[in-house]
């Protein structure tokens, strides 16, 4: 009922407020009225009492309005402010006590501040700078105009205008102006450069420093740079800040005090690495000190951060022009020196000079060396660079810049490699071994690399990059035979580019190095740093996470991941992980730690004969070959052969943690849990924080039904790396099994005894202690040789429970796919809700899994429940990789799908029609 249903026919008038007809203030009208807004107006009029006080009618209106609109604002009632009478005695005593204690604390704080002001600031009055007054203004010719002329000047004759020289008079005016603008700086000597901050709080120091800095800014803007330096110095003495150092550096540049400005810039970069203003100002000081290469580096870093910085672009062009001019001049001088060296053939220091000559990149002659030097250097012609982490080798202050040490042998910055690679490198180097002194020549890749290492250590990164580029050019024709050596050279050149600020060049070289040697730690780290410098935080995060898969104990990568995760959270919100590119899974074959027996042998037996070196190289080669064969066997799921390969590796070197963890993985795949646990124990003795060892030992304990120990190890894994989702899922599974074991211990024991007897009959004495009842799904999923380990008549079937998440479903379906068990797969589909199928499959839909699902639906499920088959086919088409899978299946598999749809069409059912089947066939591109 609305207001239009009751027109004002009786003429009783309307209310003053809202103009409501009087007859609407009635029980019957209010009871039938459904207009909430009108009822609110009526209630407002009744409460105001302008038409009389009707408590029952008001209450009735409130109840009716509450029934129609419980959230109506008109139902709210004003509540008076609480007083002491509103509380109990205990409550009021507590409130009153809190207020009194707060008042007393505030008074104490005020007294402290007052006492501090009266005690501290009088002592500082002597140290404060003078108040600016008339005496600090510019003295514009005060003495010249202070005295009155005693006699009036007589007017000049008109003839004197003929002698008037306009140019001279203009010159006098200019000189007079310069004299007038001389600033009186006598007051600067009275200002002390330091402020006494004894007894001041941090807030007061900050206030004083800010005030002095603002004074310096005023002086700088007025052109008085000396006064600006003075006030900036006072600000720094009160509280050193990046802004004050930066401003003082700019003022020093204006005064052309290059050394002071350089020191201030260095201080800024210590406090805030990567500060753009400091880099730009340090580049200016480098330019005026004729340190052009250093200026180029700083300007490149500025342009990487701010590509549109016009001042940096202009300065860089000037520096590059000066650098080209200086290089042209130095080349002319060098050529003259080389002519002198070539003329003197029998000088005593010929060897040293010719060595310098070839290091400079010119000349055709080689330095005279003993005949054995080339043979001694041959095994390490293209050795590996020393295995130092980027954070340690390149962190800290920049090394002192200077000329590289001359006359170094190729071993100075390189590890040893196999003779086969050495010979390949020598062949690629253009016959470096063809001359007696081919160990250090410019055509020798090892010599170029050694020179590059020395230049890098001395801080000459551009020259080092040139040497590495020359070595790469010599080795590239050799092809994949020396891929590892080329990868090292690309990685070294990437380090040079990273130091120079050429991040794009660094990324390109790291990509090339990773193509030649996948999952190499140094290129991954350097590429991550370059991405982070370019503010491509997502790509940097992925690279750091990949590095942590190789070595989880690397502190540099851990810190970077934590820092980047916070940045990405701020940029992309809580769902930032969804925007990342997928993190590549590092194969189990990639070792956690690098081992270099040849390097150890050289460090211990530096003076041994070449036969000992050859033995170390042979051991390393054998070890590496066996490990790679074992890794390949793991990739092929041939775990027994991989087991023997890793065991052979441990005979050569039993201190390699990665071999123990890899062999433990093989034992887990073969369900030899006790042996897997022992290998994990050995790995943890070598590296007590190894995540893989803890995780695999937890799986071994789970297989041995030691759920409590498995729980402890999984908690350690999550503590070391909370991002491992598999560990969290395993933790949930083990917790569930532990609770189940506590509840049904007698039944579990009977079941266990019965299954042990079956295992002894079927599998003999190979695995006497294997508990098959609680075999981990990971073991079943990854066991490719399932058919070979069981006889075809084996009656044991895989126990299948309803999966709760994608991980459990994936483990079960992988195990079924390995066993080709269509009946069990049909049972799994029967207990799985079709709508959950896309979520469970996730992005793991593979060809063999897809074929197994289709075969199970066709052979085992269509006769029992056609509607369930239709639902599964419908939701299977919504899986992530479904469209891609359709492009990869064979013609025979397509015919199998067509037969399934034909059987589905021939089966009558009320849950779907022929049109539905035809539409679904179009989804399957049939």
Curated annotation (Swiss-Prot):
SMART domains named in the record: TPR (SM00028)
Residues in the signal sequence: none
Organism: Homo sapiens (Human)
Compositional bias (Low complexity): 369-379
Disease: Ciliary dyskinesia, primary, 28: A disorder characterized by abnormalities of motile cilia. Respiratory infections leading to chronic inflammation and bronchiectasis are recurrent, due to defects in the respiratory cilia. Patients may exhibit randomization of left-right body asymmetry and situs inversus, due to dysfunction of monocilia at the embryonic node. Primary ciliary dyskinesia associated with situs inversus is referred to as Kartagener syndrome.
Compartments (UniProt record): Cytoplasm; Dynein axonemal particle
Positions contributing to GTP binding: 781-788
Keyword Endoplasmic reticulum: no
Record's compositionally biased regions (Basic and acidic residues): 352-368, 758-769, 784-799
Classification of source organism: Eukaryota, Metazoa, Chordata, Craniata, Vertebrata
Domain of life where this protein originates: Eukaryota
A Pfam match: TPR_8
TPR repeat feature ranges: 209-242, 244-275, 276-309, 445-478, 487-520, 522-554, 623-656, 657-690, 692-724
Location of the region described as Disordered in the Swiss-Prot/TrEMBL record: 318-452, 758-801
Tissue-specific expression: Present in most tissues, including lung, with the strongest expression in brain, colon, kidney, and testis. In sperm and testis, detected in particular in pachytene primary spermatocytes. Up-regulated in pancreatic tumor tissues and not in normal pancreatic tissue.
Positions with biased composition (Gly residues): 428-441
GO biological process: axonemal dynein complex assembly; protein stabilization; single fertilization
InterPro entries the UniProt entry points to: CiliaryAsmbly_MitoImport, RPAP3-like_C, TPR-like_helical_dom_sf, TPR_rpt
UniProt name for this protein: Sperm-associated antigen 1
Keyword annotations from UniProtKB, A to Z: Ciliopathy, Cytoplasm, Fertilization, GTP-binding, Hydrolase, Kartagener syndrome, Nucleotide-binding, Phosphoprotein, Primary ciliary dyskinesia, Repeat, TPR repeat
